[in-house]
Amino acid sequence: MASKKNGPRVSEGRFGTGVVNRREFLGAAAASTASLLAQPAYEWGGPVLDIHLHLRQDPESNFAHITGSGVTKAVLLARVQAVDQAKVLAERHPGRFVWFVSADVTKPENDALLTKAVRSGALGLGEIKNQVECDGPEMKRMYALAADLNVPIQIHFGDVPQAAGNAVFNGGFKRFDKMLQAFPKTNFIAHADTFWANVSSDYAYNTAYPSGPIRPGGISDKWLSDYPHLWADMSANSCNNFLQRDPEFTAGFLVRHQDKLMFGCDCSCSDGRGGGNTNPSPRLHGKCIARETLAAVQRMSTPEVFRKIRWENGAKLLRITSQA
């Protein structure tokens, strides 16, 4: 019988003889657990970049939303007054957030604040949503600033007043191609109802969320093909409505513009699973827009196209190299 003075217990097996003590075993187990935790479990088959998540009154609820919806990294949309909150949240959750910045474009003095924010880490200007014309002097100034700073600009196009807001934002979308021509060095990210409604050539500007089959030849579809510096933000009810209207057309659209489309949510639910979402659309009430849109795009596209939309296109435009 071996004496206890002879040292740790020896274990023998078919892999030979080794010395294992309790401290080493616990250390190895902890290392194994850490390794497993470090390996991301992707709910959507790979990393997801959400390019449209507004900074919330309780910033930690942003983290709850991306965790619940299976998003890997999100672009926080912060007003210039809330830049410090966006920075703190990004630092608190390394690798999970980047951020854009916006301000009232009718005040030229805000240009300096936007410039300062970009130089301190903002990856883009947005969401720009003001009651101005998309080809007016205020927005022309923003387009030039985005080009000078070498960051994209994310624009809310809303020509039809909605009951909740009763206002027009960046109006005159039919004329926006002139801006695309005038600012070839600016990367534009188009968002909201007027952009997505205009995928159909018969849009009558009588509702923010048209229904029914899509008639080919819409200006949004055409401009995505014609202008390499125009990208599309697939967030909110506006894009989700487009996805549901005409699945056969939409499948072709996703293939046609697979290098220009970027997933976003613009969702107000609390937990990434629909909690607290009071969206007036019966289609989305009580649901997470992020989940609904990701599921629709995944269902209508190939794995390769879905990969581009959920991650690669946004990462390329924003020059994001890390998935964490």
Go through each PLM region and give its residues.
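H/E-rich (His + Asp/Glu) clusters that bind or coordinate divalent metals
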Residues: 2-7, 12-15, 57-60, 195-324
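N-terminal secretory signal peptides and thylakoid transit peptides that target proteins
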Residues: 6-32
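An N-terminally biased module of ancient metal coordination in phosphate/nucleic-acid-related enzymes
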Residues: 25-26, 39-95
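Hydrophobic faces of well-ordered beta-strands that scaffold small-molecule active sites
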Residues: 49-53, 74-76, 99-101, 125-126, ...
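Active-site gating/metal-coordination segments in enzymes
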Residues: 80-171, 231, 236
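Helix C-cap/helix->beta junction micro-motif
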Residues: 93, 148-149, 183-184, 226-227, ...
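Charged helix-capping and loop-helix junction motifs
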Residues: 136-143, 168-174, 213-217, 245-249
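Active-site cradle of extracellular carbohydrate-active enzymes
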Residues: 166, 171-183, 188-201, 219
